[in-house]
Swiss-Prot record:
GO MF annotations, alphabetized: ATP binding; pantoate-beta-alanine ligase activity
Protein's name according to its UniProt entry: Pantothenate synthetase
Gene3D superfamilies membership: HUPs, Pantoate-beta-alanine ligase, C-terminal domain
Subcellular location: Cytoplasm
InterPro entries referenced in this protein's UniProt entry, alphabetically: Pantoate_ligase (IPR003721), Pantoate_ligase_C (IPR042176), Rossmann-like_a/b/a_fold (IPR014729)
Annotated family: Belongs to the pantothenate synthetase family.
Catalytic machinery residues: 37 (proton donor)
Additional notes on this entry: The reaction proceeds by a bi uni uni bi ping pong mechanism.
Keywords: ATP-binding, Cytoplasm, Ligase, Nucleotide-binding, Pantothenate biosynthesis
Gene this protein is translated from: panC
Enzyme nomenclature, EC number: 6.3.2.1
Top enzyme category: ligase
Oxidoreductase recorded as keyword: no
Protein species of origin: Psychromonas ingrahamii (strain DSM 17664 / CCUG 51855 / 37)
General function of this protein: Catalyzes the condensation of pantoate with beta-alanine in an ATP-dependent reaction via a pantoyl-adenylate intermediate.
Length: 289
């Protein structure tokens, strides 16, 4: 396994791999890896002979300087996990090599409609930072495939749209959310939960799953279902940040043409913000929206 921190050195290695006819699968991460990330690696290994993982805590997608400072840095442990998983190359650039002129002078990429709604309203600039770094990493790595988790549903939708809009020759591989035995979606943030919070945390997925059943039943207006779900979470000690039920393709309001809806959940448990989502197939014979 190679660990490369220099973009030019990476370019040279990529050129060599391309000359050899090797296909490349790419997994971009910000480190602090868990089993969910390793599932992305496995998905890449099913597609290509060479798997490259980047570990880069991207300052452009943080709109809170303290969050950036506090983000866990576990490089040694991450590299051990990736070596054991059979990753071929780990790319670990410094911010100065990715943004040599600083963030304010950096050209950026933005997918306007998908980036400015839902999570984008709560975190201004976050998705612009995400799409910019993913675009730059795609240019450096030149992958044939790129693997993204479905847990970050809006991020996945934005990356798909960016690749389509810009004509990138990359196949995006969505990978199902990995869950703990209790149903909680795996996340780097779960390690911040106290023992008591870890006992409460699975309720987020349980409420979401019941919400999915109720959405499919189509007997109650979506706004009422959302309010009821928020009350259940708040009464259990969560602080509901946002619950949305939107068209799974457009991320806009569900309408009579929507084939699938996605339930997007975000709630604080103590200081930790947990997210989850679930796609629901719609039957419009009796939809209440």
């Amino acid at each position: 396994m190679l660990i490369i921190d220099n973009p030019q050195q990476l370019r040279e290695k990529i050129k060599q791999l391309k000359q050899q006819g090797s296909e490349i699968a790419f997994v971009p991460t910000m480190g602090n890896l868990h089993e969910g990330h390793l599932t992305l690696v496995q998905a890449g290994q099913k597609k290509a002979a060479v798997v490259i993982v980047s570990i880069f805590i991207n300052p452009m997608q943080f709109n809170n300087a303290q969050d950036l400072l506090n983000y866990p840095k576990t490089m040694a442990q991450d590299c051990e996990k990736l070596a054991a998983a059979g990753v071929n190359i780990i790319f670990t650039p410094a911010a100065s090599s990715i943004y040599p002129n600083g963030l304010n002078a950096q050209t950026y990429v933005e997918v306007p409609l998908l980036s400015n709604c839902l999570e984008g309203e709560l975190r201004p600039g976050h998705f612009r930072g995400m799409s910019t770094i993913v675009n730059k990493l795609f240019n450096l790595v030149q992958p044939d495939y790129a693997c993204f988790g479905e847990k970050d549903f809006q991020q996945l939708a934005i990356v798909k749209q960016m690749v389509s809009d810009l004509g990138m020759p990359i196949e995006i591989i969505p990978v199902a959310t990995m869950r703990e035995k209790n149903g909680l979606a795996m996340s780097s943030r779960n390690g911040k939960l106290s023992s008591l919070e870890k006992q409460k945390a699975p309720l987020l997925a349980k409420v979401m799953n019941q919400l999915a059943v109720d959405v499919q039943a189509q007997k109650t207006e979506l706004s009422i279902l959302i309010d009821d779900a928020s009350i259940i979470l708040n009464n259990a000690g969560f602080n509901t940040d946002a619950i949305h039920i939107v068209d799974a393709q457009t991320l806009q309001a569900v309408n009579c043409h929507s084939k699938e809806a996605v339930i997007l959940m975000a709630a604080f448990l103590g200081e930790t913000r947990l997210i989850d989502n679930k796609v629901v197939i719609l039957n419009h014979s009796a939809t209440k929206i």
